[in-house]
Swiss-Prot record:
Protein name per its UniProtKB record: Probable beta-glucosidase A
Native source species: Aspergillus terreus (strain NIH 2624 / FGSC A1156)
GO molecular function terms listed in the Swiss-Prot or TrEMBL record: beta-glucosidase activity
Primary location recorded for the protein, binned into one broad class: secreted
Signal peptide, first to last residue: 1-19
Entry superkingdom: Eukaryota
EC nos: 3.2.1.21
Root EC class: hydrolase
Glycan attachment points: 62, 212, 253, 316, 323, 355, 524, 543, 565, 669, 713
Subcellular localization, as worded in the UniProt entry: Secreted
């Protein structure tokens, strides 16, 4: 029996798959929907259609295909259409700043933005990043990320995203996208979808670690979980107008992410109404015709393997149209989607060529780095793009600090007689802030994790530097020990300190780097570099120990968090270049901590449920990672199994106190939901396709080695493609309906950006009064949770939140709304969102378990 996406996977992640018939299955969905320019895309779509109508076939293909790894200045670069003034598009990492560049800022990670619970700061960070990317001549930022969502706390790249809660992630994901695109740069929502672990994400990478597999991991999930958890933030991204989506390395129900017709054609383009373009993750492109028909619009970096000179697109895409296996309208739609995104963000007005090289810091070099060909020219212009962004970086760093525990130790007065700064995490990397490639080591303070989701630091203020400056202002003594294994000296300093500030960390990152035996994903949730022993030593010698944790997510603290000599605990995440200043702002009370933990702190790793899949379980085939927990991850799981966390999702203390009161609920719209009906328009072809002789390489063209071109070597299409299987019957690899350009039925849940417009109609207005009952100004985050009812639903789920600044003694009324999507469940039979007949109850408070206010909602449909 095959398990369709409409059914829950029935195999455990640890079990050995016995037969191919037992594998999860992703049903096909064709044809690939064509853009129609609805909503805010209208003007950009019209301009895109106009320009694409003037292009030849090979010019369109040039837009869809990267030129190859290390062939141009950016990590990804498309071909150009110089005849029409369309430049090569530069695509560059990362979600927290410009990777492989210089004179750029290193922003806090997405997980820190989540800890602020601040929509405005999410937007400001996005806008600041977009400005830097634009100033460097980058057209497409490869970020932000909502995949991984954070299914497992030990997932290597969770920190690149926001939170395991889809609502918190979705809001901040969307605000980040708006900020980036308001700066004139195309944002990329990634990694789509179910990219929840690093193990087995790429075959070559896994084989390099000694695993005998021939296909990447398959993330197997049921339809309800897909919609209510993992697809949720991507719907918010589409609704925000995101220009690009990056498909992921993993398979989804045993179909590769970049050729999965259900996730790309049905969910993203048909149901959510995505109007931009889908690009592959780097070398996540596995076929030509199959990927094109399944919805992949752009191949990155263009070559099949790095510097191979071969491509599934390029010449082969041209051949596919000429021999009829790929309809012209499909390639036209690819080009229209790319150009529509380009025009939508106003890139045509802001475009400048890249003024840096990803491959060298030398000022001069060859135009084409890998083959050392082309003009020898200035490749790095050393343009400083930082502006005043250090201010927002420091602000986010401070506002994302979560005060987990405070027994009166904080804030510090600045008059402490002796301050001990203890732990390697307080100091500098001996190799320098950028001493490890892609931050692939854990030395010194952890302000950024590792992998392609990184940026070079322009500088890094360490906690030791910043705190020493504070102590010197008060004429105190300050002693630091940053060797975690010198417990004798640590004890000596702790014993004479008025307050001991202990800095510890836990790192993770992308799977292409192995750091201390962690192949991207964390091996465990313990502290790194002997961190537990440092804390134990200090608490034995100092009765005023404050622990600061820089980490990629939760760590196990059960052994020491309740120790009476641990008087304060702060989580500071990955705060970027202003790390030391940000934590000093909080420690010394210039900033009243208002961060809330965006994940749950459990007592053991087992508290979180299913472990990562770290051993192959399907022979040498695709490892099968079954998401049997469904929607029950993080706090939802803790609630389901009545697990008591150490610190619950949404928890965070302040230097003041708040009180919530006066819950009011008002029905503002009782209209019924109307599923979308009708048909789309027919697919359109723009321009005409000539015979093969029109697409031969131009005479006199000096070809660059390994460069990916769109032209033909010969009018003999088989000779041009170089594919030994060329000429196989179409029915063997072209799915039924895949080339059909006739009007198609609209899905019930479709109809607008993010889905059916009725989902976003506000039904209820909710208001609450928040009073600052303390003596200092501070920030509070009222959080609204909904119980959807039903026997198999989470106890409650987050739906709304707002960060508010409130003066002492002041009251503020927070007003929010609940729309239909907030109250609905995914109906796997109707294939639509439905508000079930079960009672709906709302809860408002300051964490997922501190919810003093509650109210029952009237029934709506």
């Amino acid at each position: 029996m095959k398990l369709s996406i409409l059914e829950a996977a029935a195999l455990t992640a640890a079990s050995v798959v016995s037969a191919q018939d037992d594998l999860a299955y992703s049903p096909p969905y064709y044809p690939s929907p064509w853009a129609d320019g609805h909503g805010e895309w209208s003007n950009a779509y019209k301009r895109a259609v106009d320009i694409v109508s003037q292009m030849t076939l090979t010019e369109k293909v040039n837009l869809t295909t990267g030129t190859g790894w290390e062939l141009e200045r950016c990590v990804g670069q498309t071909g150009s259409v110089p005849r029409l003034g369309i430049p090569s598009l530069c695509l560059q990492d990362s979600p927290l700043g410009i990777r492989m560049s210089d004179y750029n800022s290193a922003f806090p990670a997405g997980i820190n933005v989540a800890a602020t619970w601040d929509k405005k700061l999410a937007y400001q960070r996005g806008k600041a990043m977009g400005e830097e990317f634009s100033d460097k001549g980058i057209d497409v930022q490869l970020g932000p990320a909502a995949g991984p969502l954070g299914r497992s706390p030990d997932g290597g790249r969770n920190w690149e995203g926001f939170s395991p809660d889809p609502a918190l992630t979705g809001v901040l994901f969307a605000e980040t996208i708006k900020g980036i695109q308001d700066a004139g740069v195309i944002a990329t929502a990634k990694h789509y979808i179910l990219n929840e672990q690093e193990h087995f994400r790429q075959v070559g990478e896994a084989q390099g670690y000694g695993f005998n597999i021939t296909e990447t991991v398959s993330s197997n999930v049921d339809d309800k979980t897909m919609h209510e958890l993992y697809l949720w933030p991507f719907a918010d991204a589409v609704r925000a107008g995101v220009g690009a989506v990056m498909c992921s390395y993993n398979q989804i129900n045993n179909s590769y992410g970049c050729q999965n017709s259900l996730t790309l054609n049905k969910l993203l383009k048909a149901e959510l109404g995505f109007q931009g373009f889908v690009m592959s993750d780097w070398s996540a492109h596995h076929s030509g015709v199959g990927a094109a028909l399944a919805g992949l619009d752009m191949s990155m970096p263009g070559d099949i393997s790095f510097d191979s000179g071969t491509s599934f697109y390029g010449t082969n895409l041209t051949v596919g149209v000429l021999n009829g296996t790929i309809p012209q309208w499909r390639v036209d739609d690819m080009a229209v989607r790319i150009m529509a995104a380009y025009y939508k963000v106003g890139r045509d007005r802001l475009w400048t060529p890249p003024n840096f090289s990803s491959w060298t810091r030398d000022e001069y070099g060859f135009a084409h780095f890998f083959p050392s060909e082309g003009a020898y020219e200035r490749v790095n212009e050393f343009v400083n793009v930082q502006r005043d962004h250090a201010q927002v970086i420091r602000r986010i760093g401070a506002d994302s600090v979560v005060l987990l525990k405070n027994d009166g130790a904080l804030p510090l007065t600045g008059q402490e007689k002796t301050v001990g700064i203890l732990g390697e995490d307080a100091g500098s990397n001996p190799k320098g802030a950028n001493g490890c490639s892609d931050r692939g080591c854990d030395k010194g303070t952890l302000a950024m994790a590792w992998g392609s989701g990184t940026a070079n630091f322009p500088y890094l203020v360490t906690p030791e530097q910043a705190i020493q400056n504070e102590v010197l202002k008060g004429r105190g003594n300050v002693f630091a020990v940053t060797d975690n294994y010198d417990t004798q000296q640590i004890a000596a300093v702790a014993s004479q300190s008025t307050v001991s500030l202990v800095f510890v960390n836990a790192d993770a990152g992308e799977g292409f780097l192995n750091v201390d035996g962690n192949m991207g994903d964390r091996k465990n949730l313990t502290l790194w570099q002997n961190g537990e022993e440092v804390i134990k030593t200090v608490t034995e010698h100092c009765n005023n120990t404050v622990v600061v944790i820089h980490s990629v997510g939760p760590v196990l603290i059960d052994e020491w968090y309740a120790h009476p000599n641990v008087t304060g605990i702060l989580w500071a995440g990955l705060p970027g270049q202003e790390s030391g200043n940000a934590i000093a702002d909080v420690l010394y009370g210039r900033v009243n901590p208002g961060g809330k933990t965006p994940f749950t702190w459990g007592k053991t790793r087992a508290s979180y449920g299913d472990y990562l899949l770290t051993e192959p379980n399907n022979g040498n085939g695709a490892p099968q990672d079954n998401f049997n927990e469904g929607v029950f991850i993080d706090y939802r799981r803790f609630d389901k199994y009545n697990e008591t966390p150490i610190y619950e999702f949404g928890h965070g203390l302040s230097y003041t106190t708040f009180e919530l009161s006066g819950l009011q609920v008002q029905l503002i719209n009782g209209s019924s939901y109307v599923p979308t009906t009708g048909q789309t328009s027919a697919a359109q072809a723009f321009g005409k396709v000539e015979d093969a002789s029109s697409y031969l390489y131009p005479e006199g063209l000096k070809r660059i080695s390994k460069f990916i071109y769109p032209w033909l070597n010969s009018t003999d299409l088989k000779a041009s493609t170089g594919d030994p299987e060329y000429g196989e019957p179409n029915f063997e690899y072209i799915p039924e309906g895949a080339t059909d350009g006739s009007p198609q039925p609209r899905l019930p849940a479709s109809g607008g950006p993010g889905g059916n417009p009725g989902l976003y109609e506000d039904l209820f207005q909710v208001s609450v009064t928040i009073t600052n009952t303390g003596k200092v100004a501070g920030d509070e985050v009222p959080q609204l949770y909904v119980s959807l009812g039903g026997p198999n639903e989470p106890k409650r789920v987050l739906r709304k939140f707002e960060r508010l600044h409130i003066a002492p003694g002041q009251q503020k009324v927070w007003t929010t709304t609940l729309n239909r999507r907030d109250l609905a469940n995914w109906d796997v039979v109707a294939q639509d969102w439905k508000i079930t007949p079960y009672a709906k109850t709302i809860f408002v408070g300051t964490s997922s378990r501190k919810l003093p206010l509650a109210g029952r909602l009237p029934r709506v449909q």
